[in-house]
């Protein structure tokens, strides 16, 4: 049996500081703009009382939220659309598997937290390509609106008891 693999030897030269470099030419202009191998990215998103820890792994677009599929965790199509928005904005649908752990808050808050976490993770994957579109769509901004506290002497945060002039 003969081994028919073609091996290409790369030649490296050493400069006066002892740093090795290649004398080969730069990559061609038609090289892909996005990196071929993408490392997994982690990020955290928060919304109201909800916190989502997100991990993006190169894959086929599978979602795992607290050990369940996206459809079973968020049965409402609106929440699914909110969560998927960063992928639609960056045109990367189906390129990453999402593994998320969410706790606290309600369903809408959790969907918002997951959206922010996914957007931050996509930003971490490729800042130059993804950040402008995510920033323009407002997906990298934390929504700071939270429940206003109840004040003493009032029925709710702002609702006062009925006032009688006489």
From Swiss-Prot:
GO terms for biological process: translation. GO terms for molecular function: RNA binding; structural constituent of ribosome. Pfam families: Ribosomal_S9 (PF00380). Keywords: Ribonucleoprotein, Ribosomal protein. Coiled coil: none annotated. GO terms for cellular component: cytoplasm; small ribosomal subunit. Residues 1-16 have a biased composition (Acidic residues). It comes from the Bacteria. InterPro entries: Ribosomal_Su5_D2-typ_SF, Ribosomal_uS9, Ribosomal_uS9_bac/plastid, Ribosomal_uS9_CS, Ribsml_uS5_D2-typ_fold_subgr. Residues 1-45 are annotated as: Disordered. PANTHER family: RIBOSOMAL PROTEIN S9 (PTHR21569), SMALL RIBOSOMAL SUBUNIT PROTEIN US9M (PTHR21569:SF1). Belongs to the universal ribosomal protein uS9 family. This is Small ribosomal subunit protein uS9.
């Amino acid at each position: 049996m003969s081994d028919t693999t073609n091996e290409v030897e790369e030649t490296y030269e050493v400069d006066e500081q002892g740093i090795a470099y290649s004398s080969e030419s730069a990559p061609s202009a038609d090289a892909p703009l996005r990196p071929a191998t993408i490392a997994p990215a982690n990020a955290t998103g928060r919304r109201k009382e909800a916190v989502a820890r997100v991990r993006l792994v190169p894959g086929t677009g599978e979602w795992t939220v607290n050990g369940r599929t996206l459809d079973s965790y968020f049965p409402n199509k609106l929440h699914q659309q909110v969560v998927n928005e960063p992928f639609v904005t960056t045109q990367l649908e189906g390129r990453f598997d999402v593994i998320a752990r969410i706790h606290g808050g309600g369903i809408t808050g959790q969907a918002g937290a997951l959206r922010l976490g996914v957007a931050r993770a996509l930003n971490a994957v490729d800042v130059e390509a993804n950040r402008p579109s995510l920033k323009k769509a407002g997906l990298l901004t934390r929504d700071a609106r939270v429940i206003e506290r109840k004040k003493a002497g009032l029925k709710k945060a702002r609702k006062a008891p009925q006032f009688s002039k006489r």
